[in-house]
Amino acid sequence: MEAKAAPKPAASGACSVSAEETEKWMEEAMHMAKEALENTEVPVGCLMVYNNEVVGKGRNEVNQTKNATRHAEMVAIDQVLDWCRQSGKSPSEVFEHTVLYVTVEPCIMCAAALRLMKIPLVVYGCQNERFGGCGSVLNIASADLPNTGRPFQCIPGYRAEEAVEMLKTFYKQENPNAPKSKVRKKECQKS
């Protein structure tokens, strides 16, 4: 397992996490990613942790819901909003002190949502070289974007190899929900 040094507090001073906390929460995020894989979803899992409590967690639900926006981070954001309603907490106060642990770099859509919610810190596993919003494709996390929330700190590479292996496993299998025109053609094998 790859271990990274404990993150420094975010620029706003809103939060910091230890190496032990990072390991604990990333283990649970990996479990969520495995659950996604078992349900024929892209294996991405995440947790949103506020005051050392999981207030939202998610895994990709795109195939299950047939809704392309149901990425792990968006599912978790919805859970945090529900938790805030039930707890009588201000969502802005909670998000500004929440750390996101996610197995894969958030895509551009999710990075924009995290920025709008003013999440100060994102710890992620592997890069998302096709859709990454934290530097791999665009850097939504730290770009100078007026009126779009607050930039956030990223700590990449935590258990990246494990996250990549799960993605490879997913992309080797058939997607039963794919349109017929998109299904990979299997090569005929000669005897």
From Swiss-Prot:
It is an enzyme of class 3 (hydrolase). One of its GO terms (molecular function) is zinc ion binding. One of its GO terms (biological process) is tRNA wobble adenosine to inosine editing. Zn(2+) binds at residues 71, 107, 110. The active site is at 73 (proton donor). The keyword tRNA processing applies. Its EC number is 3.5.4.33. Keywords: Hydrolase, Metal-binding, tRNA processing, Zinc. SUPFAM superfamilies: Cytidine deaminase-like (SSF53927). CDD domains: nucleoside_deaminase. HAMAP family: tRNA_aden_deaminase. Belongs to the cytidine and deoxycytidylate deaminase family. ADAT2 subfamily. This is tRNA-specific adenosine deaminase 2. It comes from Homo sapiens.
